[in-house]
């Protein structure tokens, strides 16, 4: 036995030596090889198999649910199946088939044309979990799950992210995935514009959908358009909303005429979420302002959030969205909007209107609005509070060169907010508490990364 073990050991040592001796030769051979980038035209080419599946809402969040997806142009029977979720596979026999209500062909910058389809599930039951899949009757996606909203004001949570825009698959994917990991019960995601860099670049939309993956098919999206969702800007006016926008996002058409699926509102369990298009100016912005006043005046919800791309108070040096601020801020203050969620400036800041003599300001017990600018992608700009300071606003927390995501939880009279860095560190946070009369008190979150850094700076000076 000892001889056998010794012999085996000898052979092992000899084999190891041979392998080690072979390594340099293998490395030389590998070094001579050159990798070739796989073409985007092949990576993102559509097929009969559904992809880019995404949930959104066109109507009542308690009784409807929209889903959009992409195939090649040869699919002529786009459809979806839906059933109340069960613990076993028997639900499939009970699934109802719904034919797509719309299909649109889109030809972007790649040498192929794709077809986008939309189904709007209707007459659903509130507070109910459903399973669905999309396809053509033969080629199907996997089964996805979603839950309808309650028809009452019950607790819920959602995610908010700023610009993804550049190097989306490489750098943004971890952010959106970590966000969901931190808030797996999120009911929707607000995207504050510039989801991509070039509105008609199919490979960029392909990266965006791939980064979110199955999450898009289970959690509804509420997107607002940024300047990069437009083909170009001519004399301050956008020209050509991305041809992908409406085919792939099925959104409410309750906004002013001419702003279908870019200016709209959605009600969810006691909160009204409003999307505005700040890419337009002049009379086109005036139309939105008139519509916005009606939507705010006739608002039965306890909470109100507005999202648009260009900030009321700019973070970036040299930027100043004067018309947006002059036309929107009076209504925001008049109707005590709770949160204004923005993007565009590729840094983070959170603040409020500076204390006024009357006490009507965002940090008093009577007034309210918290303004946030954030970024989730890798494109970064410098930060300055100059535009905030010069226009009667105060920055509470700010950071540059950092990707972030935001978690918002709503429970009755309390809204809590967290801004976390890409790796999950708590950078900023606050809580809004409302009294029955509508007055608000804002409590800053303690023990954040921002607080720790400020304390370290203070200690270093001492």
Roles of regions detected by a PLM:
Residues 2, 11-160, 181, 401, ...:
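Acidic, histidine-bearing metal-coordination/catalytic regions of metal-dependent phosphoesterases
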Residues 115-121, 129-145, 203-300, 327, ...:
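Extended active-site neighborhood of metal-dependent phosphoesterases/phosphodiesterases
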Residues 139-192, 197-198:
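An acidic-aromatic substrate-binding cleft motif
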Residues 155-157, 187-188, 263, 270-271, ...:
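Alpha/beta-hydrolase fold active-site loops
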Residues 160-162, 188-194, 221-227, 276-277, ...:
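Active-site neighborhood of phospho(di)ester-bond hydrolases with catalytic His/Asp-centered motifs
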Residues 161-167, 192-204, 233-234, 275-285, ...:
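The substrate-binding groove and active-site-proximal loops of carbohydrate-active enzymes
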Residues 180-182, 297, 333:
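Non-catalytic positions within long, well-ordered alpha-helices that form the structural scaffold/packing
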Residues 299-342:
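Active-site-proximal segments of metal-dependent phosphoesterases and phosphodiesterases across multiple
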